[in-house]
Design a protein with these regions (language model features):
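Short conserved segments within the C-terminal catalytic ATPase subdomain
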Residues: 60-70
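Conserved micro-motifs of the catalytic ATP-binding
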Residues: 34-39, 76-80
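Short alpha-helical segment of the dimerization/phosphotransfer core of two-component systems
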Residues: 14-19
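Short helix-loop "hinge" at the ATP-lid/N-box region of the Bergerat-fold HATPase_c
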Residues: 95-99
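Short conserved segment of the HATPase_c
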Residues: 131-143
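Acidic ATP/Mg2+-coordinating residue in the GHKL
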Residues: 126
Length: 193
């Protein structure tokens, strides 16, 4: 680091994190068909874990000049932290990948706790390119890139597919809403325990 310029060091961290995410995707994909899945469930704080995921992806977010905000009260849920971190990493990666150039890219993590229903949700919203309404029903399908695939060569159609598979393993319900040119929100609904 001493012999590198700050710009080269920042770019090197960006490439390192990008490679790490690709390797994680490959490893999670290879585990999909496993008969026995090694999942340790424990109490985790949602926003604290979101902050850890942001820290793990900080070079990607800084390179794209993202602002990150958090709202709501931190809530305990029972989940597998490693799997939840993977989900968050993929969502962050997509937000960076589909950020609109020449804007102030932003991502927000918002926790809602409904005491009446016992439902705890995490909404992760960005102000990126958004997803066409015609593509929304297919974004969790394996290999689906939609319109994004035609203009972004890095699109593999695997990120949200793996997010959906991991969420299913963790009993987290997923919803996605998006408006073209306005951004995307992914909502994670944690099981009641």
């Amino acid at each position: 680091k001493v012999e590198m310029s700050p710009l080269v060091h920042t770019r090197m961290l960006y490439v390192r994190d990008h490679v790490r995410q690709n390797v994680e995707q490959i490893l999670y994909f290879s585990r999909l068909g496993a008969a026995h899945k090694d999942c340790y469930f424990e109490p985790i704080l949602i926003l604290e874990t979101c902050r850890e995921a942001v820290e793990d992806n900080l070079s990607l977010l800084e390179e794209a000049q993202f602002s990150v905000t958090y709202s709501g009260n931190d809530c305990n849920v029972i989940s597998n932290k490693k799997g939840f971190m993977f989900i968050l990493g993929q969502i962050i990666s997509n937000s960076v990948k589909y950020a609109v150039k020449d804007t102030a890219p932003a991502i927000q993590f918002s926790v809602t706790d409904n005491p009446e229903s016992g439902q705890i949700t995490l909404s992760v919203s960005d102000n990126g390119t958004g997803i066409p309404a015609s593509d929304l029903p297919f974004v969790f399908d394996k290999g689906f890139t939609g319109d994004a695939g035609s203009f972004l060569s890095r699109s593999t159609g695997m990120g949200l597919y793996l997010v959906q598979k991991m969420a299913k393993d963790l009993a987290i319900d997923l919803q996605i809403t998006s408006q073209l040119s306005c951004g995307t929100t992914i909502i994670l609904m944690f099981p009641k325990v």
